[in-house]
Amino acid sequence: MKITELLSPENIRQGVSFSSKKRLFESIAHFVEEQILAEKGEQACFECLFEREKLGNSGLGNGIAMPKAKIPVTVSDKAIAVFMQLDNPIDYDAFDGKPVDLIFALLIPENQCETYIPVLASLIEKLTDKNVLKQLRSAKSADEIWQVFEITDQSETTFEEVKE
């Protein structure tokens, strides 16, 4: 699965600021509810992200984090992705000790988690590529961020193609 099949341009936020990881998760949950879920899941999304983070830090190193969580099917029956480029890095307790300024959040329906394991591995590989990170950080708009993901996807074989 390509990034552009999972993420939509409308779910990219550029130039946002947060004081903490908790405020970031609150904002992701609010954004998801406001833009996608039509007032039926903000608290559930926040709690799922926050509880999942307690199990293990989602910082990938080099200033990027990929918070992810299982969400009830009653909240959404399809995966939801949000990308954020922060104005100011936040302390994230990442394993490398570096603050985080790029966030790729992924909310997966609880009945589809197994399907997304290979997708997560592919996302992590792409999101930790130093050239991709450099381009994402230098992007000045959500459109430029989207273009980075489109270019990244052009060089990818989709998961479905690999299975055949």
UniProtKB/Swiss-Prot annotation:
Which InterPro entries is this protein grouped with? PTrfase/Anion_transptr, PTS_EIIA_type-2_dom, PTS_Nitro_regul, PTS_SugarTrans_NitroReg
What functional role does this protein have?
Answer: Not known; lacks the phosphorylation site found in other PtsN proteins.
Has UniProt tagged this entry with the keyword RNA-binding?
no
Taxonomic source organism: Haemophilus influenzae (strain ATCC 51907 / DSM 11121 / KW20 / Rd)
Tell whether Flavoprotein is among the UniProt keywords: no
**CDD domains cross-referenced by the UniProt entry:** PTS_IIA_fru
User: In this record, what's one Pfam family?
Assistant: PTS_EIIA_2
Q: Example GO biological process term?
A: phosphoenolpyruvate-dependent sugar phosphotransferase system
Q: Which gene encodes it?
A: ptsN
Its keywords, alphabetically, are:
Phosphotransferase system
Domain called PTS EIIA type-2: residue spans: 5-152
Protein name as it appears in the record: Nitrogen regulatory protein homolog
GO MF terms, alphabetically ordered: protein kinase activator activity; protein-N(PI)-phosphohistidine-sugar phosphotransferase activity
PROSITE patterns, sorted: PTS_EIIA_TYPE_2 (PS51094)
